[in-house]
């Protein structure tokens, strides 16, 4: 009769440990990836508000054009990778030279892990420029 060695008794231990830790590691990696996507959306939203403020500050709209609508359109166009229907833009200004133009935008986000919403809310960004 062959004597059993300690290595033979622990043959499947590594596989069991791997099977137990793999789901936790996968959720951690997927969570980091989802956080990266949310951060990317925030950067795009910030760049879009900055582009809208820089577009609207020197905008000379003598006559019939609506500056607010033009700035809102510029912000939505600048947020190319975001769903423009969900980008909520507000523009605040008196449009007098030397006053501030404030462009704010918000965009909803949700961090999902395996179909479960872990965190949700809205990303917000505001940019202020001086009207020329």
Enumerate the predicted regions with their spans.
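Intrinsic-disorder/low-complexity peptide segments enriched for small residues
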Residues: 5, 28, 33, 80, ...
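Solvent-exposed, flexible loop/coil residues
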Residues: 22, 39, 43, 59, ...
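Generic marker of residues within folded, mature protein domains
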Residues: 25-27, 95, 117
């Amino acid at each position: 009769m062959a004597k059993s060695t300690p290595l033979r008794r622990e043959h499947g231990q590594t596989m069991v440990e791997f099977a137990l830790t793999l789901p936790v590691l996968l959720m951690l990696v997927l969570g980091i990836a989802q956080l990266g996507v949310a951060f990317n959306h925030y950067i795009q939203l910030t760049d879009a508000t900055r582009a809208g403020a820089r577009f609207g500050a020197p905008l000379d709209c003598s006559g019939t054009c609506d500056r607010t609508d033009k700035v809102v359109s510029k912000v939505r166009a600048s947020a190319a990778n975001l769903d423009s229907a969900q980008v909520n833009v507000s523009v605040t200004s008196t449009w007098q030279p030397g006053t501030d133009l404030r462009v704010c935008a918000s965009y909803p986000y949700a961090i999902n892990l395996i179909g479960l919403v872990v965190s949700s809310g809205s990303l917000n960004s505001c940019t202020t420029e001086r009207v020329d």
